[in-house]
């Protein structure tokens, strides 16, 4: 479980990592989570109908997205896809940042307030930060309405910036950055991009999201 693969770019991307071993029933095998992301529309594309938000996919549908686009030396990706009994399709959508969250004694939090593309591990993370900020404001005392407005003013601009950053790939935008410089591939990453350039992309996102290491 120490290895994670994130490959491809913003148009096609593979996320792959082992979860657990089952040495009793399936020796040498691992329960593995894999995701194939494919950009199939843009900001003008209508949001899918509700019935399409979680549907079973045909294996051939996924293999077509992978063919000639994604591969890893770590394993046989087409074989992994074929071996997966149930494959599901989920649309990846977000919403434009809202102008207001708090209305009187009612406010929004988490995905209800800032649905965003699932990159950078920020869906639940930002909801936790929302909850902490809201609890801090309410614990400070004073009118509830004022506490909710203060929470709104603290969290809404921060999460709006993350929504916008995730549209550009979030921290995984480092992959697109390298691909743009070396579209035909490379054998020496340092010859394509300086380590400081790559660290800056990831570090800027960590600071934006609020989980950069302190110190």
Listing of model-derived features with the role each one plays in the protein:
Residues 1-215:
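FAD-dependent flavoprotein oxygenase/oxidase catalytic domain
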